[in-house]
Amino acid sequence: MANLEKKRVVVTGLGAITPIGNTLQDYWQGLMEGRNGIGPITRFDASDQACRFGGEVKDFDATQFLDRKEAKRMDRFCHFAVCASQQAINDAKLVINELNADEIGVLIGTGIGGLKVLEDQQTILLDKGPSRCSPFMIPMMIANMASGLTAINLGAKGPNNCTVTACAAGSNAIGDAFRLVQNGYAKAMICGGTEAAITPLSYAGFASARALSFRNDDPLHASRPFDKDRDGFVMGEGSGILILEELESALARGAKIYGEMVGYAMTCDAYHITAPVPDGRGATRAIAWALKDSGLKPEMVSYINAHGTSTPANDVTETRAIKQALGNHAYNIAVSSTKSMTGHLLGGSGGIEAVATVMAIAEDKVPPTINLENPDPECDLDYVPGQSRALIVDVALSNSFGFGGHNVTLAFKKYQ
């Protein structure tokens, strides 16, 4: 039941399946090393595609957490979500049982959902007829199954939902889960984002929209946020999951606490289906409102995990928004884009980037922006170029923006 007294919300578990590592430890180590997860596409024949590279998850085995029969009935985006959620639950040492199952929920966002199964079943429909289509096609395809299957796998019977807000979906899921715990609707939420959109149709569509990088001769340097020579984003895949828990619950069971979530805001540009409003006013409001929600002042911010897609429009617009929201203090903080290493996971990006943001607070280190070799004069902040950095991180923000004009900012701080 809802409680009028707002609860403090802490992060007690993290899980990550990414192009640079399939566990939290490997992912964080990869970020600290500046590991590059981009390479030629191996999941399908991309020889006729305008873009032929991406950030694939490597050496991933869904049967580590799922039996083979279950795994066959799930799309890859659900594999990532269910397995990353199991990692996070294990990390939190949170036992779900008959006594607490109703108080633990799931909220996982995705921008697209099961696109691969849709493509495969469309081919079967055209080649063999409707009677040969799989009875599992619909539950494998629909976006909410990442949350649904995670709940089934873990036995979590509390609030359950799915956000589908393009590239802001993972961050919206975390923010909405934060509100549920903060307002007493759940003791803990398993939340984040997932995506598996490295497919022929996805690449064809994003390439036609001129959103992707076409640097086929040099994929390792294609994702270059805030660099003058950037030419589009690089597709990635994977999932990042957080366990958000009521502080009293976490303390009662002696849980490890990575940090505290303190603010969330979302706005809309109401401007264009794909392009951000050039003056960045929508993103500016999201950043400012998240700080207001948290009760923190701009000068308290140490680090921002930027949306930083490596597209010509986003990086300049986001830089403007950060400066407009934080004033002159924007020049005193570290801002980095981990998409330079992982590529852009679309709806999954908010999940893995929130994980990185929380780890920056816990470890007092910030990830770099790799491939930033020729800075854009309009992008004039400290983007932590090239190498990770030791930095006392007391307050950190994570930005996510999506097609449709969605803007989301999450605010975290050290637990004290």
From Swiss-Prot:
Concerning its family, UniProt says:
Belongs to the thiolase-like superfamily. Beta-ketoacyl-ACP synthases family.
Q: Which residues cross the membrane?
A: none
GO function terms (MF aspect): 3-oxoacyl-[acyl-carrier-protein] synthase activity
Active site residues per record:
C167, H307, H344
Reaction catalysed by this enzyme? a fatty acyl-[ACP] + malonyl-[ACP] + H(+) = a 3-oxoacyl-[ACP] + holo-[ACP] + CO2; (9Z)-hexadecenoyl-[ACP] + malonyl-[ACP] + H(+) = 3-oxo-(11Z)-octadecenoyl-[ACP] + holo-[ACP] + CO2
| EC number(s) given by UniProt | 2.3.1.179
Record-annotated Ketosynthase family 3 (KS3) domain positions: 6-414
CDD domains given in the database record: KAS_I_II
Q: Which InterPro entries match?
A: 3-oxoacyl-ACP_synth-2 (IPR017568), Beta-ketoacyl_synthase (IPR000794), Ketoacyl_synth_AS (IPR018201), Ketoacyl_synth_C (IPR014031), Ketoacyl_synth_N (IPR014030), PKS_Beta-ketoAc_synthase_dom (IPR020841), Thiolase-like (IPR016039)
**Keyword set, alphabetical order:** Acyltransferase, Fatty acid biosynthesis, Fatty acid metabolism, Lipid biosynthesis, Lipid metabolism, Transferase
- What is the name of the protein in this document? 3-oxoacyl-[acyl-carrier-protein] synthase 2
Question: Which pathway does this chain act in?
Answer: Lipid metabolism; fatty acid biosynthesis
* Entry GO CC: cytosol
How does this protein assemble?
A: Homodimer.
A single GO BP? fatty acid biosynthetic process
Report the protein's function: Involved in the type II fatty acid elongation cycle. Catalyzes the elongation of a wide range of acyl-ACP by the addition of two carbons from malonyl-ACP to an acyl acceptor. Can efficiently catalyze the conversion of palmitoleoyl-ACP (cis-hexadec-9-enoyl-ACP) to cis-vaccenoyl-ACP (cis-octadec-11-enoyl-ACP), an essential step in the thermal regulation of fatty acid composition.
